[in-house]
From Swiss-Prot:
Transmembrane segments: none annotated. The lineage of its organism: Bacteria, Bacillati, Bacillota, Clostridia, Thermoanaerobacterales. Keywords: Aminoacyl-tRNA synthetase, ATP-binding, Cytoplasm, Ligase, Magnesium, Metal-binding, Nucleotide-binding, Protein biosynthesis. This is Phenylalanine--tRNA ligase alpha subunit. It catalyses: tRNA(Phe) + L-phenylalanine + ATP = L-phenylalanyl-tRNA(Phe) + AMP + diphosphate + H(+). CDD domains: PheRS_alpha_core. Its cofactor is Mg(2+).
Length: 339
C-alpha cells in the first residue's frame, strides 16, 4: 500500500503541473480526493493492515492528501492569475490613442433661425420673455383689444380647450403678461410655438413658431420701431437689404403696418421667390394700442410702445429656399442633414 501511495502522489503531481485550466484542476481534485477518488479508495483498504502498519500508512496517506491539496491550491491560484493577466492584456486600452469621434447632431433649421434672431435682438438690448402655450382667452384676445365678435375667435380658427382656455394663436399674450409684471422701460422678445386651426399644406400648419417683440417707454415713436426693424433686417438678411412699411390693421396696435424687405434672391429686381415684385413680406408691427397698455396697467398718457411679430417658419423657408413647410416637421434625415 505504501508503494501505491507513493506512485499515486507522483502521478498526481505530474498531472497537476500539466493542468492548463481551472476546469482541469477541478477534475484532478475529484479524481484523487473526491468521495470516489483514487486516494479515498486506497484508504478504504487500510482495514486489512496489521496494527503496526496502520499508523505508518495512515501518516503517509495524510501526507499525500495534504501534498495533493496544496499542489491543487497553488496550481489553481497560478492558473487564475495567468487567466486574469491574459484577459487584462486582451482588453488593454491604450489611453494615449485618439478616441473615436462621436457623431454629433445639429440644430434644426427653425432653431438655427430662431437663435440667430435672438442674438440680433439681445445685442440691441432686448431680453427674452416666455409665456404659457395653453393660455387664457382673456390674454389671447380681450387684453389684446380683440372683441368677442372678432373672426379670429371662431372655433374654426382657434383650438379651444374650454370656453375660456385655449392653445394660444400668437405669442402676443406674452406682451400683456410682461407689462402686468414689469414696469417700463420694457424691451423683450418672446419666441415660441403657436397654434391655429389650419389644414396642413405647403404653406400652412396647425403648429408653427412666432417671435414677438415689445418696447414700452416714455417717448417711443414709430420712428423707433422703424429704426429697430431696419437694423434687424440688415443684420439678418444683409447690409444691402432695404425695407418698406405698408399700412395694415391689427387690433392690438395703432397705427399698424406690415414690413417688407427687398428680395435677397434677386436684389429687388423681381424673381419667382418674391413673386416678381422685388419685395418679401416678413412681419407685422405697429404702435401698442392705448387700450392694450391700459388693460395691462400702464398709463397710455405717459408711456407709448411698439410691438412686432414675425413667423419663424416663414423666415426659415425664405432663408434656406424651402418651398414646402411640411419638410420642416417630417423628420426626413435626407432633408435635415443639409443644415
Amino acid at each position: 500500500m505504501e508503494e501505491l501511495l507513493k506512485e499515486l502522489s507522483k502521478r498526481a503531481e505530474e498531472e497537476i503541473l500539466k493542468a492548463k485550466s481551472l476546469q482541469e484542476i477541478e477534475s484532478l481534485r475529484v479524481k484523487y480526493l473526491g468521495k470516489k477518488g483514487e486516494l479515498t479508495q486506497i484508504l478504504r483498504g487500510m482495514g486489512s493492515l496489521s496494527p503496526e502498519e496502520r499508523p505508518v500508512i495512515g501518516q503517509l496517506a495524510n501526507d499525500v492528501r495534504e501534498k495533493i491539496e496544496n499542489m491543487i491550491l497553488e496550481r489553481r491560484e497560478k492558473i487564475a492569475k495567468e487567466e486574469k493577466e491574459r484577459k487584462i492584456k486582451e482588453e488593454y486600452i491604450d489611453i494615449t490613442m485618439p478616441g473615436k469621434p462621436y457623431k454629433y447632431g445639429h440644430k434644426h433649421p427653425i432653431t438655427l433661425v430662431m437663435d440667430e434672431i435672438k442674438r440680433i435682438f439681445l445685442g440691441l438690448g432686448f431680453s427674452i420673455a416666455e409665456g404659457p402655450e395653453v393660455e387664457l382667452a382673456y390674454y389671447n384676445f380681450e387684453a389684446l383689444n380683440t372683441p368677442e365678435d372678432h373672426p379670429a375667435r371662431d372655433l374654426q380658427d382657434t383650438f379651444y380647450i374650454t370656453s375660456d382656455i385655449l392653445l394660444r394663436t400668437q405669442t402676443s399674450p406674452v406682451q400683456v403678461r410682461t407689462m402686468e409684471k414689469t414696469k417700463p422701460p420694457i424691451r423683450v422678445i418672446s419666441p415660441g410655438r403657436v397654434y391655429r386651426s389650419d389644414d396642413i399644406d405647403a404653406t400652412h400648419s396647425p403648429v408653427f413658431h412666432q417671435m414677438e417683440g415689445l418696447v414700452v417707454d416714455e417717448g417711443i415713436t414709430m420712428g423707433d420701431l422703424k429704426g429697430v426693424l431696419n437694423v434687424f433686417a440688415k443684420k439678418f438678411f444683409g447690409e444691402q437689404t432695404k425695407t418698406k412699411f405698408r399700412p395694415h390693421f391689427f387690433p392690438f396696435t395703432e397705427p399698424s403696418a406690415e414690413m417688407d424687405v427687398s428680395c435677397f434672391a434677386c436684389g429687388g429686381k423681381g424673381c419667382r421667390v418674391c413673386g416678381y415684385t422685388g419685395w418679401i413680406e416678413i412681419l407685422g408691427a405697429g404702435m401698442v394700442h392705448p387700450n392694450v397698455l391700459r388693460m395691462s396697467g400702464i398709463d397710455p398718457e405717459k408711456y407709448t410702445g411698439f410691438a412686432f411679430g414675425l413667423g419663424i417658419d416663414r423666415i426659415a423657408m425664405l432663408k434656406y429656399g424651402i418651398e414646402d413647410l411640411r419638410l420642416l416637421f417630417e423628420n426626413d434625415m435626407r432633408f435635415i442633414e443639409q443644415f
